């Protein structure tokens, strides 16, 4: 209890401090009320001018803290004049918490949108841009349109960033004081900005301050989903079809084992024997059969662990992922690692080609790049540890403006799902007769349709809100609080939407919320409850459970089943006890703990790629922003030459290999005959460097003389092509390394440490290959002046296609190099490049 008391005391202390500062804002109400509209806008200009004279971000933040009461008072007065709404004290407190870079946890209906206007205005005064982030484009559009009235009144500009906007429109949106956008679009724009060829093609400014609405949904629920920009990879889809046919033949327990708790599925020995016969291979687990076993495992996952209308839907011949937290489909998103193709094979729709990742980032790493990050939501306290550890954000529970009157009733648990759903329908019928509006929450699309059919049989008119008809969301939600309304909704039930009570509903007990199953996350259950009882309204909530629910099957239903059997309870008799609720909450905590651990592991692995991505993007940006790229090229020429001397000449064990060294120099830098063995034999390494460097320098100058003012554009083109080509291959190689790295634990190795070490080695090899290619293309390309090198057009990202540096050539995919394989220096390199080992990964 000591730890819990500390948390509660900490929140109470924070609330008192916020309350005192909010009182200072309210105290300025009369003084602000006498200002004219023009005087308010002049105040904004004054703040902006004073902040523009401060070039240090920390000093700017100190100044913002100083003017906070006056700035917030201006926003309150502006809101009063524009919307005829004055933010309450609790909203001011929430706004202060957000300005501090924390999360304001505010109940549904407490006015988070208006709360955010105060910290948004204050931080936008610095002129560095504020991003207000919502979970979907509909909310971004609505909020930007509504709030622009207030911000324009105060003298600030507002932009809206949508996926459909052109590059110019996006750039203009980001240039405004305040920009509304979705988290997805921000992440993709960041990746695109780091794939352009010219600085003027970028759309974003440096990331300064972000306020995330429904912050738990974006930073927790979506943290494990990376944003990926990809191009198609040429690969046959026939193996998916074969694996699908094979998976359909298999029987559980005989041919494969399935663990419902972990959702892991794998072949038994009998299943492996069948696979060897079906695919005509001697040993399924031989290295050369890795593709076969990978496709079989993926097909098994598609058939056993994923259900249609629960995990995905098929719409117009296309497989669409269903977001497990919102119930919405996610057009454009695809399962990775071939799983989407396996589902397409399972459902008999066209199998689309696999894609090759060109750029990727997780939300965890994207949002940690902001100077300051804050958020608001109705449900965050259960995930406070994760917010603190990963994002350095504290969760502050803001009091409600009016006391909560909702009655949260104990869970009712039934033996079977049939008994549960019968009871749910009876409850709905009873409430409907009285005229009380009912909101039924379901976890899956198929459940919502099942209940809908039961209600139809009883003659109850109702609306269904799920991924299949989400376009009517606003209309359905608007009517959900009216007398006699019955609404069935998946978890999408209104993140960012308010259910307002109709006339006479308060007297009937307000909105009744019925949950038909517990979600694995307590936050999602709390969000469903929170649809009722907004702003002091009456309401009630209750969850109906059964021992056949997925969460109960995965965790602890056996004990309850024995207990219910001893009591002699039948299908129609529920248990209502604190023990049941505690057991369910305990199961949820275990799932949440597992998910947190998984997100932490992802972050640890992603940290390796984050550092590498930072180096590559910085390198690209410096090439784009520098007017003269010759210094970069010069450094690459020198380091590549020095590396070759260290390898061929400075050998501790062997005699210097003069001829192989000359062959390498001729391949990368010079023409045959430019350097002979007589030129370098008997000389030490330093002298050899000087002799060869003089020749390279002359060849480099010769290219400059031919191309003259076009040389810089030529170098930039070669550098960017080389970086992009090798970086794309490197991402693919790192992905392959990561997919199999967990198997190292069976050999008592540390998978994360191995991934870090080998990832570092692969990155070093990639950087060397970039330098080699750049040197070779710049010195060995035959370019005529009349070729008139034109500026390359930046890749069209809308189609997520990327033009390779060597159009028309089929790229050889690098194979992982297994340590311990004895490869001769003159043997072909096992990476598959076609070069000798000593000239490739043997350097």
Curated annotation (Swiss-Prot):
One of its GO terms (molecular function) is ATP binding. Its main location: membrane. The lineage of its organism: Bacteria, Bacillati, Bacillota, Bacilli, Bacillales. The gene is secA1. It comes from the Bacteria. One of its GO terms (cellular component) is cell envelope Sec protein transport complex. Its cofactor is Zn(2+). One of its GO terms (biological process) is protein targeting. It is an enzyme of class 7 (translocase). Residues 799-813 have a biased composition (Basic and acidic residues). It is found in: Cell membrane; Cytoplasm. Induction: Expressed in log phase cells (at protein level). Transmembrane segments: none annotated. It comes from Staphylococcus aureus (strain NCTC 8325 / PS 47). This is Protein translocase subunit SecA 1. Signal peptide: none annotated. Part of the Sec protein translocase complex. Interacts with the SecYEG preprotein conducting channel. Has a central role in coupling the hydrolysis of ATP to the transfer of proteins into and across the cell membrane, serving as an ATP-driven molecular motor driving the stepwise translocation of polypeptide chains across the membrane. Monomer and homodimer. Part of the essential Sec protein translocation apparatus which comprises SecA, SecYEG and auxiliary proteins SecDF. Other proteins may also be involved.
């Amino acid at each position: 209890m000591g730890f819990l008391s500390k948390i509660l005391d900490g929140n109470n202390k924070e609330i008192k401090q916020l309350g005192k500062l909010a009182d200072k804002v309210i105290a300025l109400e009369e003084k602000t009320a006498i200002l004219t509209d023009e005087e308010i806008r002049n105040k904004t200009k004054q703040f902006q001018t004073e902040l523009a004279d401060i070039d240090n971000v920390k000093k700017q933040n100190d100044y913002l803290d100083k003017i906070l009461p006056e700035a917030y008072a201006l926003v309150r007065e502006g809101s009063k004049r524009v919307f005829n709404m004055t933010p309450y004290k609790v909203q001011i407190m929430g706004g202060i918490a957000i300005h501090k870079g924390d999360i304001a946890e505010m109940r549904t209906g407490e006015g988070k949108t208006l709360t955010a206007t105060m910290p948004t205005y204050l931080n936008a005064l610095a002129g560095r841009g504020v991003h207000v982030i919502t979970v979907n484009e509909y909310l971004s559009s609505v909020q930007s349109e509504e709030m622009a009235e207030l911000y324009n009144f105060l003298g600030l500009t507002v932009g809206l960033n949508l996926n459909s906007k052109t590059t110019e429109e996006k750039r203009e949106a980001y240039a405004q004081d305040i920009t509304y956008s979705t988290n997805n679009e921000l992440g993709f724009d960041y990746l695109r900005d780091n794939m352009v060829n010219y600085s003027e093609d970028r759309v974003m400014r440096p990331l300064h301050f972000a306020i995330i609405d429904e912050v738990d949904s974006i930073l927790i629920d979506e943290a494990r989903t990376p944003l990926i920009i990809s191009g198609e990879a040429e690969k046959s889809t026939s193996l998916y079809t074969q694996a699908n046919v094979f998976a359909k033949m298999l029987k559980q327990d005989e041919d494969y084992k399935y663990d419902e708790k972990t959702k892991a599925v794998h072949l038994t020995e009998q299943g492996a024997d069948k696979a060897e016969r079906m695919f005509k291979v001697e040993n399924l687990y031989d290295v050369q059969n890795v593709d076969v076993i990978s496709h079989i495992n993926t097909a098994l996952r598609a058939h056993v662990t994923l259900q249609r209308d629960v995990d995905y839907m098929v719409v117009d011949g296309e497989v669409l992922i269903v977001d497990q937290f919102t119930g919405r489909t996610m057009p454009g998103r695809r399962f990775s690692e071939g799983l989407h193709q396996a589902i397409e094979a399972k459902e008999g729709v066209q199998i689309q080609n696999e894609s090759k990742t060109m750029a990727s980032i997780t939300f965890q790493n994207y949002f940690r790049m902001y100077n300051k990050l804050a958020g608001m939501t109705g449900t965050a306290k259960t995930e406070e540890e994760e917010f603190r550890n990963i994002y350095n954000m504290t969760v502050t529970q803001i009091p409600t403006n009016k006391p909560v009157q909702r009655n949260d009733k104990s869970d009712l648990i039934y033996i079977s799902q049939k008994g549960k759903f019968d009871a749910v329908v009876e409850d709905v019928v009873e409430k409907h007769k009285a005229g009380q509006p009912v909101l039924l929450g379901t976890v899956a699309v198929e459940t919502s349709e099942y209940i809908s059919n039961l209600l139809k049989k009883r003659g109850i008119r109702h609306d269904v809100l799920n991924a299949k008809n989400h376009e009517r969301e606003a209309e359905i939600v608007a009517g959900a609080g009216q007398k006699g309304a019955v609404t069935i909704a998946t978890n999408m039930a209104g993140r960012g939407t308010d259910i307002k009570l109709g006339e006479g509903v308060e007297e009937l007990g307000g909105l009744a919320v019925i949950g038909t199953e517990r979600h694995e996350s307590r936050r999602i259950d709390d969000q469903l409850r929170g649809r009722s009882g907004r702003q002091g309204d009456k309401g009630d909530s209750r969850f109906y459970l059964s021992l056949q629910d997925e969460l109960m099957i995965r965790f602890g239903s056996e004990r309850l089943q024995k207990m219910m059997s001893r009591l002699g309870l039948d299908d129609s008799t529920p248990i209502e006890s604190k023990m049941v609720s505690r057991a369910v909450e305990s199961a949820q905590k275990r799932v949440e703990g597992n998910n947190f651990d998984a997100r932490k592991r992802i972050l640890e692995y992603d940290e390796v790629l984050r550092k590498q991505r930072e180096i590559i993007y910085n390198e690209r940006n410096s090439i784009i922003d520098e007017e003269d790229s010759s210094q970069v090229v010069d450094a690459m020429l020198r380091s590549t030459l020095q590396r070759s001397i260290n390898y061929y000449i400075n050998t501790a064990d062997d005699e210097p290999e003069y001829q192989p060294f000359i062959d390498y120099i001729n391949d990368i830098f010079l023409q045959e005959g430019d350097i002979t063995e007589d030129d370098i034999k008997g000389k030490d390494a330093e002298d050899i460097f000087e002799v060869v460097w003089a020749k390279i320098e002359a060849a480099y100058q010769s290219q400059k003389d031919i191309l003259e003012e076009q040389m810089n554009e030529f170098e930039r083109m070669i550098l960017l092509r080389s970086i992009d080509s090798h970086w794309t291959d490197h991402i693919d190689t790192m992905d392959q390394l990561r997919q199999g790295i967990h198997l190292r634990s069976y050999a008592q190795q540390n998978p994360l440490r191995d991934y870090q070490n080998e990832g570092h080695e692969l990155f070093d090899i990639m950087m060397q290959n970039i330098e080699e290619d750049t040197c070779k293309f710049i010195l060995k390309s035959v370019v005529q002046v009349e070729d008139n090198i034109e500026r390359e057009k930046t890749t069209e990202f809308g189609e997520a296609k990327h033009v390779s540096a060597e159009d028309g050539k089929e790229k050889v995919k690098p194979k992982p190099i297994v340590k311990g394989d004895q490869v001769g220096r003159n043997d072909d390199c096992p990476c598959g490049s076609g070069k000798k080992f000593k000239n490739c990964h043997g350097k």
